[in-house]
Amino acid sequence: MAKKIVGYIKLQVPAGKANPSPPIGPALGQRGLNIMEFCKAFNAQTQGMEPGMPIPVVITAYADKSFTFTMKTPPATFLLKKAAGIKSGSAKAHVDKVGKVTRAQLEEIAKTKQADLTAADLDAAVRTIAGSARSMGLEVEGV
């Protein structure tokens, strides 16, 4: 018989930097899950990634206090900021442009994000990422 699921916990945790402090500790603690076990497993799985890269993770909590977790790809905004070489997006996205991204950079990001996007093909995924870039105040070239 399958384990009974008691809830899901969604967090964004920096790669390789999971520790019991907030937000991880309180979120897992209120469900009675082993915080250090999650931190060690998460840090081991994100060992090869760029340290500090935010990784969305969905933790499935079971009635017997066990858990499983699935990691998703980094947020598109993080990847776009990294590609454009900026710290943050524009406060007035359609007025003030803060950087540029090329079609090649958008395709690279779309390939990374394709598993998490609902786009039918790569071109649709590129258009989705381009829309995110425009809403951040980035100038999109070649789309």
UniProtKB/Swiss-Prot annotation:
The keyword RNA-binding applies. One or more lysine residues are methylated. Pfam families: Ribosomal_L11, Ribosomal_L11_N. Belongs to the universal ribosomal protein uL11 family. The lineage of its organism: Bacteria, Pseudomonadati, Pseudomonadota, Betaproteobacteria, Neisseriales. The gene is rplK. Part of the ribosomal stalk of the 50S ribosomal subunit. Interacts with L10 and the large rRNA to form the base of the stalk. L10 forms an elongated spine to which L12 dimers bind in a sequential fashion forming a multimeric L10(L12)X complex. Keywords: Methylation, Ribonucleoprotein, Ribosomal protein, RNA-binding, rRNA-binding. GO terms for cellular component: cytosolic large ribosomal subunit. Forms part of the ribosomal stalk which helps the ribosome interact with GTP-bound translation factors. PROSITE patterns: RIBOSOMAL_L11. It comes from the Bacteria. CDD domains: Ribosomal_L11 (cd00349). GO terms for biological process: translation. One of its GO terms (molecular function) is structural constituent of ribosome. This is Large ribosomal subunit protein uL11. Gene3D superfamilies: Ribosomal protein L11, C-terminal domain, Ribosomal protein L11/L12, N-terminal domain.
